[in-house]
Structures are given as structure tokens and as C-alpha cells.
Amino acid sequence: DHAVWTRMYIIESLNDSNATGPAAARLLQNQVDIGNAIKPVYGDAAGTQLTALLREHILIAVDIIDAVKARNATAQAAAEARWTRNADQIATFLASANPNWPKATLQNLLYTHLSTTKAELVARYTRNYTADVAAWDAVYNHILVMADALSDGILKQHPEKFPGPAVYSQSQVDLQAGMRKLWTDHTVWTRLYIIESLNNSSAAAPAAARLLQNQA
């Protein structure tokens, strides 16, 4: 949801679309959902704090997008510096909650999230839609890596909270993860093609090609 709705917001904002507001609201709700997801493990205060940090992450991203649209390099650089500081704050907070989340590892994960998202924004803004497709794949593949690292850390720290009789082989786990990714790709690229096609956008053809690749 985080990566998908960030992409939707980028597209709608760069198009100055009436859908920008609803996309922003849904993206901000995702930060509440992420905070709520950790409350059963780390408590209400921790969940609320994570939501606040992630909300700032999104609002800074909005500032970066606005600066790119305005071609204001000074404002963009300042916002990107704030984005990095916010990533450091998120890493510090998470590392303090779980020893299986080393701060340096989290920083690397978050910095890659920022860089791949920026590449997506730049490709979209410059209307390099082939690069835009590749950038989105990089964003999405990395967000899965980050999500796995976070969930693995929780499972290692609190195995008692997640009891389960079934023990799956690595091949079974890989199959399940692969199928989820493929069907998520299918849904996301169908939606993106619908948006591009209805807007008569030059991005429709690259989106269609990526959607057809998913079927292969």
C-alpha cells in the first residue's frame, strides 16, 4: 500500500488531477495502518510515534514533488535533506524497539527507498515512461525487501506472539511470496493502465507492455 499509493499520488499530482486529494488521503491512511500494525507488539505509544514519523516522511515527499513541479532546485534540495533526516529518525526509533533491526541496516533500507522513489518521480516528471516502468519495479521490489526485514525482525524478537503449527519449506515460502508478487503486479499494472488510458497519456503503452509482461 505504501509504495502503491505513493506512486498514485505522484501520478495524480504531476497531472494536477482532481484525484490528487483522495490519493493523498489514502496514502496518509496507510501510515496510520502501519502504526496500528505494530501496536499489538510494541504498544499504542510506539505505534502512534511510528505513524507520526511516517506521516512526516509522506509530507516531505509532497514538498519534494511540489518543488520538482515548480522547478525550484533550492527547495527540492532542502526537502530532500529533511527526507534523509526523517529516515534517520525512523531508523533510530525502530532500532531502539528491536535488536534485530540494526540502525545501519535500516538506514540503508530507507535510503534505498528514498532513492528509488526519487528516481520514479524524476522519470515520471521528465515523461520517460519506459524508465518510469523500470523505476516502479525497483521501488516495489525494494519495498518487499524492507517489509520482509521488518517482519522477520518481529518474528525473531517475539516468536511467542506468532505461534503456528505449520512449518513451511523454503520452496513453499518462495512460491507463496512469488505468487503474491505476481498477482499484486497484475492488479497494480491494471490500475495504472486504466489511469493512463483514460488520461490519453503517452504512458499508456509502456503500462500496457508491463501489464502484458506480467501475464507471461
Model feature map: region roles:
Residues 1-13, 17-20, 24-27, 31, ...:
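C-terminal amphipathic alpha-helix
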Residues 28-65, 216:
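Mid-chain, structured segments of secreted extracytoplasmic proteins
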